[in-house]
């Protein structure tokens, strides 16, 4: 999978920009606050429909403009696919092959991307919310069914919490409707949990291979799923997970009615990264934490390829400066030649000697971009 063309109109500090990307490695060079990250963000938004940096979509629209538009041409094994997303105060509109898409699950997955930014190093030591978002975004790209189930789960969860609040405030007394919402939550929650467990097993395989390589065989990485409900590892069938979640929700109802909140389910779960038998978040060194984060992010490349038959597009936002020399080499060895990569940096000095393929270099200054292929 490749992004062959990208056009921005009134996106952040870009008035109008049109670029083509014939090469596998694309470097965006410039000082800070010139628009490098905005460019990578636009590719991410084109793929995922949302920014990874802000939930306020107005920030994506250029100053005194009514809307921003991102369009691109994606090349797959099956042919080229034009994509477009229009962002305005009225919301977002997405198009595939010039046809508007009504459902998110019909759009996401047309362009698969992996973003690696300095903040992704907090994947290991950050909050559980960071890790839940990670698995939801990555799994959602390769499985439209998961994305649908997740959206349904979140919708029912919101309704259930609202109804719990109404019951707590005595505005409602009918618990039959709560039973219905609880059954729906267990149905979709079980599906989300089932998909996550399967995905993590595959991710662990690829991540451990990379982690052992980076650590020269000294460390083994495993990933544990920390569920908010007890899980019987002898029966991880969809039906068993749904029944267990339903039973735990029913058992916890008194507390939920008192607190007017849902305390159990995939929205409360977490991931644990275990290196040589110890939780790296708690006991790992900074080096181990960074190796783990790098292994997890790079593992997504092979995992997405195995799931979709296509390599994703890799977005590296000023991450090279956060990695030591050895980890930089492992990263570049993993991606070069097989993964189209967009990399931002303020200087080429620390990476130019490690490159084995000739990149396209784009100079970014105040929302203007100039190409120069010479290194």
From Swiss-Prot:
It is found in: Cytoplasm. One of its GO terms (molecular function) is ATP binding. InterPro entries: DNA-binding_RecF, DNA-binding_RecF_CS, P-loop_NTPase, RecF/RecN/SMC_N, RecF_2. ATP binds at residues 30-37. GO terms for cellular component: cytoplasm. The keyword DNA-binding applies. Keywords: ATP-binding, Cytoplasm, DNA damage, DNA repair, DNA replication, DNA-binding, Nucleotide-binding, SOS response. The keyword S-adenosyl-L-methionine does not apply. It holds the Pfam family SMC_N. Disulfide bonds: none annotated. GO terms for biological process: DNA replication; DNA synthesis involved in DNA repair; double-strand break repair; SOS response. Belongs to the RecF family. The RecF protein is involved in DNA metabolism; it is required for DNA replication and normal SOS inducibility. RecF binds preferentially to single-stranded, linear DNA. It also seems to bind ATP. This is DNA replication and repair protein RecF. It comes from Enterococcus faecalis (strain ATCC 700802 / V583). The gene is recF.
